[in-house]
Design a protein with these regions (language model features):
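Short amphipathic alpha-helical interaction segments
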Residues: 113-129
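Short, amphipathic alpha-helical interaction segments positioned at domain boundaries
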Residues: 100-110, 130, 149-172
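DNA-recognition alpha helix
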Residues: 56-73, 92-100
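Mixed-charge, low-complexity intrinsically disordered segments
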Residues: 78-107
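Positively charged, polyanion-binding regions of nucleic-acid-associated proteins
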Residues: 30-64, 80-81
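Minor-groove-contacting beta-hairpin "wing" of winged helix-turn-helix DNA-binding domains
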Residues: 1, 140-146
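A short, conserved structural fragment
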Residues: 125-140
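Eukaryotic partner-binding/assembly regions in large regulatory complexes
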Residues: 1-47
């Protein structure tokens, strides 16, 4: 699972994005991509849906990632996936599953880190806030106009294979 060949997500190469978000390995970056996609799906179901929820919380995103990866893995036998896609989703699901919800150091403060589910989601939302895609207020994350424009263009131009897989649709 990647952003697509020759696609500089948010104007970054994969290496630049790894450095900016704070991850080292490709699988960590791909998990961040999946979390970004999940956040997008929280606000917009498709290009025809201009109504969106007002905000998301970190716990909402974690629950959506849990459900999304579980659904894909449970359907992996019926979905027409290439070997690379199948292995990518298995790797992401196993990596996510192995993460604790929160570490003992994070019990009072939610920190961006690679050692927990909350930490990963916090890294991603921090990145999205820094890119002016989300705005934070009292641990609620609201979409900005920039986010809305990016999402509306994404759906019309680059809906892509990930959308098909997550919605149980096969490529034509």
């Amino acid at each position: 699972m990647t952003s697509g060949e020759h696609n500089r997500v948010f104007g970054f190469t994969n290496e630049e994005l790894k450095k900016t978000i704070g991850v080292r390995l490709n699988r960590e970056l791909y998990l961040c991509y999946y979390i970004i996609y999940t956040i997008m799906m929280q606000f917009y179901q498709d290009s025809a849906t201009y109504s969106y929820i007002e905000y998301v919380k970190i716990d909402d995103v974690i629950q959506a990632v849990d459900q999304g990866l579980a659904a894909v893995i449970s359907q992996i036998e019926v979905l027409v996936l290439s070997e690379i896609e199948e292995n990518s989703f298995k790797t992401l699901a196993l990596m996510w599953e192995d993460l604790p919800m929160i570490t003992t150091e994070e019990s009072t403060i939610r920190r961006a880190a690679r050692n927990s589910k909350i930490g990963y989601v916090k890294m991603v939302v921090n990145f999205m806030v820094n890119q002016r895609l989300l705005q934070e207020a009292e641990e609620r994350y609201y979409p900005t106009m920039r986010f809305r424009a990016l999402i509306e263009n994404y759906y019309t131009e680059h809906q892509g294979r990930l959308y098909e897989i997550l919605n149980g649709k096969e490529e034509n």
